[in-house]
């Protein structure tokens, strides 16, 4: 069977798919700073009777060929106009006037909010700061080729560090106001360790060593009957990009065993820094918690059977408890099939074993969401329960939980 492969785009573009070239569309997984160079879809289609079709066209008179070509052109034009109308409609629906629009990748199909540590970091930060926002899963990268990025009052900002600085300036939120100069310096140093070093070891485990499991979690819209093929193409292109970017970073020049040794050192450092504290920097939330959670959650819930998962759920159990604590508090709709009873009491374990898809709120506000849940489900909150009524195994939630959000107002 012959197969045809094409690239469909609604705008002019030039795509070089030679042996030594990579598609920049997938640079987000490797943290690439390259600008997004084209938009569209890779389409594969079977040519079951290739010779017969060509022979049939060749025997037709010229006027029939003209009709075929004209009809094809009209269909292509109609498809193009329909696409542009849908794009315009979407753009009209996401007006960012006085609203935070969070652009990120589509939810994976395993119930985890995102396979990208930075997307999960950014959305968790918005929930920690209690800032209402609207998700947009269009997949379009920012002008800098980054994901996630936000729109607010028609201003566009990319890069999680710059987004947080922007929101602090525009909206007056500050999760770090309880930190002194010395603590802020430690927080920044740990952030750089996590985002510039630990991240690459996770990317290796996720997109190189554990690629088959990651492919099962990846969600692609619009693939139709070729979704599995597209998923395979995306994952293997991403694998090549990750390996290339890791080599440029330097960490990719080491062996697999050495990369995992570096990962374990980073995880042990985080476990030692956390100790028995509620959050990384103490009893109060800070921006660092969104960063650390966004990365540790990948090891906790997206890398089944791997060394980082075994480490975080075994020897470094305080990191697992930390992840569960943040998940339950700021992601009440996120439940997982393999919830482990070691992190909870018998009373709460039964309810948490049921998988519930993540809700894509039109506008998400943590305060409003919990108020609605309280009114509908009549949860009674005690010092041993979180805002969803689940009992917490380590008595993390106490009577001053609501004050965690007051620090950023």
UniProtKB/Swiss-Prot annotation:
The chain crosses the membrane at residues 68-88. Keywords: Membrane, Transmembrane, Transmembrane helix. The keyword Methyltransferase does not apply. One of its GO terms (cellular component) is membrane. It is found in: Membrane. Residues 372-409 are annotated as: Disordered. InterPro entries: FAX/IsoI-like (IPR026928), FAXC_N (IPR045796), Glutathione-S-Trfase_C_sf (IPR036282), Metaxin_GST (IPR033468), Mito_Protein_Transport_Metaxin (IPR050931), Thioredoxin-like_fold (IPR012336), Thioredoxin-like_sf (IPR036249). It comes from the Eukaryota. It is a single-pass membrane protein. May play a role in axonal development. This is Failed axon connections homolog. It comes from Homo sapiens.
